[in-house]
Structures are given as structure tokens and as C-alpha cells.
């Protein structure tokens, strides 16, 4: 890992947190919003490994919780778990290929499903109606929207064409 990667990751995370708090609510569709921070956590998990993805998920989730005023620890726990799960798909030799393929999208969708489920359960949102209702009314739409927002990452990495890591 070069000495410039960590500052770039930190700067990218800060910019994405700012965008997630200020601009993403503007593009919400019926209160469904994509989770750009989760896309970054999955990207880091697949690029640098499970440990790095887990730690980055925890740090990004904590900073987001502090900046957004959400229940402290709910986003941190959800993103930590999502980074951990996404890290299972890390393979040093195929990392660049996975990030450029539909597999990245599928991993983002899986991580978004886990992230949204854990976040809503921990934060206690709409749980009084039951998990199936929560799944259909919030978790699945947020997951689909997050997956849709991961497509530009795949297109960019394919367009760029050079080695990622």
C-alpha cells in the first residue's frame, strides 16, 4: 500500500459523507435513498481485503452517524458487518476483475441488503409493522437504488481500463 492511498481513502470518505448527507436526499425517490458510503466500503473490501473493509466500514459508519445525527453506532455496526461480509469475496489475484464485472454489483446488492436490514433493526425504524413489511417497504427499495448507483463505478473502472491495485 502506497503512502498516498490512505489520505486518498480518507478524503474520498469525507467527500462521500458530505454528499450522502447533503445531496443524496435531493435525489431520493419516495424517501428511498442510495447508500454511496456502502459502495465505497464494498469497493475497499474487494480491493484491500476483509480486514481493511471491516475497519473502513466501522470508521465510515461512525463518522456518518456523528455527522448525520443518527442513532450512534447503528450505521457503524451495519457498515462494519457489510464490509466484513463483502470481504469474504476478496481474492488478491482477481480483485481487479471482480471490481469491473457484474460480480461487484451482486456483492454491493448483498451488502446493501445486509446493511439496510441491520441498520433498520438496530435503529428500530418501522419494526412495529413486522420484518416482512419493513423488507418490502424500505429494505428492498433502498438495496435496489444502492445497486443502481454502483453501476457508474463499474462503468468508470471499465472505461479507465488500467490496473486498479
Regions found by a protein language model. Give the residues of each.
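Terminal, non-globular segments
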Residues: 1-165
